[in-house]
Amino acid sequence: MPGHPDLELNQPSRDDTADALLKWAGEWGRDWVVVDTHPGATDVVNGALSIAHVVVTQVPLRSSDLDGTEHMVRELADYPVVLIPNFVPPVAPAAEVRRLGRIVDGTPVQVGPLIPAALAVGTRKKRMAITSEDPPAKALQPVAAALRQVAAFVQEYSA
């Protein structure tokens, strides 16, 4: 479920957000409802977090991104968080991989399957999910396979 630019100025309360999401999920009759929120502790984010079965967030293996991830893991350690390393080069940066391990060590936060870097993602013109095409463009096939692995991981995690 995407957000809207007007949402920032007209945010419902945490409880109203949670109630609305639960109501909509029931009306839609779907197994999954994915809520895309923006970073930060807003009422909308906190409402979505309060009812989430799993909180999936991508983590590029870069120093500044890991700084933010470390802060987020401390703040959200009580939530069912799964971190997905994203834009991972063919040879993952060892220091950042070790740091990610240290960030989650001693917390219930899990690290899921990685998504490989693919230049084609950044230059792609189609406005549809990469996994919607069967098969996706050759350059995107490793990314599509990884996204399917993430989906399977999340399904198993929340079962």
PLM segments and residue spans:
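P-loop/Walker-type NTP enzyme "switch/lid" segment
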Residues: M1-D31
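Beta-strand-loop-alpha "switch" segments that mediate conformational coupling across diverse proteins
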Residues: F87-P135, L147-Q149
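Histidine-centered active-site loop/cap adjacent to the catalytic His
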Residues: D134-A159
